[in-house]
């Protein structure tokens, strides 16, 4: 795949291991397979770990990522705003954080399990057991971030 007679250079950004609880190998395989598919189409692909992508101030016109780190997401937003094509948009990543996603689904009347967003400082009284209690400020990072509760 060429652009103006030159190979298209694509930047890939891997997900930090801390954001892939129990799925480090799976996430690495997904990114590797995407990179290999782009290379078969003639692209030149360079993969960077999240922290290196930010620390080295990497730029690119075409970027694909599995980012979750806040600094990486902010860097991707700046690149997107500057015209880079980012597959797995940083804005989309932010919209998939549990609280934001739940609020968007409910506000747009998308069918969604009954959900409550509460502060950990608040008393939770609705009788909705059994239920799932999920971390709201981020994606699950440890197994305890998503817990099934059968009764009070």
Feature map (PLM): residue ranges:
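ATP-binding N-terminal substructure of ATP-dependent carboxylate-amine bond-forming enzymes
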Residues: 1-87, 92
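Active-site nucleotide/adenylate-binding loops and adjacent lid/helix of ATP-dependent enzymes
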Residues: 2, 10-14, 80-83, 91-152
């Amino acid at each position: 795949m060429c652009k103006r007679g030159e190979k298209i250079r694509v930047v890939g950004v891997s997900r930090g291991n801390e954001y892939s609880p129990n799925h480090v190998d799976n996430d690495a395989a997904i990114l590797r397979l995407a990179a290999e598919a782009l290379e078969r189409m003639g692209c030149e692909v360079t993969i960077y770990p999240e922290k290196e992508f930010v620390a080295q101030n990497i730029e690119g016109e075409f970027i694909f990522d599995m980012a979750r780190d806040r600094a990486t997401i902010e860097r991707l937003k700046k690149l997107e705003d500057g015209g880079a094509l980012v597959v797995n948009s940083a804005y989309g990543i932010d919209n998939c954080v549990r609280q934001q996603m739940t609020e968007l689904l409910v506000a747009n009347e998308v069918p969604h399990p009954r959900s409550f967003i509460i502060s950990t400082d608040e008393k939770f009284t609705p009788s909705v057991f059994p239920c799932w209690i999920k971390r709201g400020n981020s994606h699950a990072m440890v197994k305890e971030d998503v817990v099934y509760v059968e009764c009070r």
